């Protein structure tokens, strides 16, 4: 088997249908699609299976998040290469072949991701620099880029050639199975978000390259699974913050680690507290304020858990490891 395409689903069947319809034309015999259905609902699962019999479906009774869902998919994958693809991405087999060709140009490239545009045609950020002490603040990050523009490639700029960068998004990520195994695969420490930066960090620590291919383009309807309602939006945005703490714990050291933890929380708590107060004053009628109030409630509970257990992992990630 040449390629295994792995998609982790959370109640995004409508998006996946568009993705599979785009792939189905000319789909090679030596490729496979594996869908891991988190918190699987039997009726929808069965209906989709009958509609797309050429796809391998795995019912996961728990909502295990993105990274661990990918791990479940990899266990069943037979491909020499692995393509991790969000359910809200639309790509053709031709675009996938083009990305495979770009990767083949440099044998040292372990992970590669293409240009991604929204349904409105606007380009999305696909790569960036590894989290550090400075870039916890958007202002300081922008100032550093202003005074030292050559330090790292700019993810907002238009690029024509292959870009070697720190990390690329896991929304559409191609990697050889051998490199995936060498790196150690997706970390179960992250329930959702930042796991792609972690994977790329461990790759670069081994001397492997990470690349962005602007010559290949796919469509990404960003947030197709993570913004379906206020509760899910609060939960996923909370997990972004938690995953930043996990990354700091795993990859920073000494004083830097402590300062990163302080900044991750300290830069967010004042705004969340203000939003929660406004949420109460407006009788919880404004969805945006309800989302931020939910983030605050979850974040404070998380910090209490950190103080109690000494672990920075999300409770959801700990559940995956139990």
Task: Give each language-model segment a name.
Residues 82:
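Short aromatic/hydrophobic "clamp" motif used to bind/position activated sugar donors
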Residues 21-30:
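Short, acidic, metal-binding catalytic loop of nucleotide-sugar glycosyltransferases
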Residues 205-284, 291:
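Active-site-adjacent helix/loop segment of glycosyltransferases
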Residues 90-127:
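Conserved donor NDP-sugar-binding/catalytic core segment of glycosyltransferases
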Residues 59-77:
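Glycine-rich, basic loop-to-helix element that forms the pyrophosphate-binding segment
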Residues 131-165:
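Short, flexible, basic/aromatic active-site loop/helix in glycosyltransferases
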Residues 158-160, 166-217:
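A short, conserved alpha-helix in the catalytic core of glycosyltransferases
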Residues 22, 37-45, 62:
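A conserved acidic beta->alpha catalytic loop
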């Amino acid at each position: 088997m040449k390629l295994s395409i792995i998609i982790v689903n959370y109640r995004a069947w409508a998006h996946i249908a568009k993705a599979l319809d785009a792939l189905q034309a000319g789909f090679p015999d030596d490729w496979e699609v594996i869908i891991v259905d988190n918190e699987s609902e039997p009726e929808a699962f069965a209906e989709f299976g009958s509609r797309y019999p050429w796809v391998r479906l795995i019912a996961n009774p728990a909502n295990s998040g993105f990274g661990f869902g990918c791990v479940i998919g990899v266990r069943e994958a037979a491909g020499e290469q692995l393509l991790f693809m969000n359910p809200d991405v639309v790509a053709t087999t031709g675009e996938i072949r083009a990305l495979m060709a770009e990767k083949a140009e440099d044998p040292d490239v372990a992970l590669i991701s293409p240009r991604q545009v929204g349904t409105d045609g606007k380009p999305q950020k696909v790569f960036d620099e590894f989290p550090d002490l400075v870039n916890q603040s958007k202002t300081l990050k922008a100032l550093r880029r202003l005074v030292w523009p050559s330090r790292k490639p700019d993810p907002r700029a238009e690029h024509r050639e292959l870009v070697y960068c720190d990390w690329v998004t896991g929304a559409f990520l191609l990697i050889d199975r051998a490199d995936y195994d060498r790196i150690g695969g997706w970390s179960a420490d992250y329930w959702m978000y930042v796991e792609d930066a972690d994977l790329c960090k461990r790759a670069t620590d081994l001397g492997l390259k990470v690349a962005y291919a602007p010559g290949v383009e796919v469509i990404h309807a960003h947030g197709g699974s993570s913004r379906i309602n206020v509760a899910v939006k609060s939960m996923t945005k909370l997990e972004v913050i938690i995953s930043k703490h996990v990354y700091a714990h795993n990859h920073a050291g000494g004083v830097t680690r402590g300062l990163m933890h302080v900044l991750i929380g300290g830069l967010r708590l004042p705004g969340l507290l203000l939003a929660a107060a406004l949420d109460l004053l407006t009788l919880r009628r404004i969805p945006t304020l309800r989302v931020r109030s939910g983030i605050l409630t979850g974040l404070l509970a998380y910090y209490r858990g950190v103080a109690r257990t000494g672990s920075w992992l999300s409770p959801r990630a700990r559940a995956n490891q139990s």
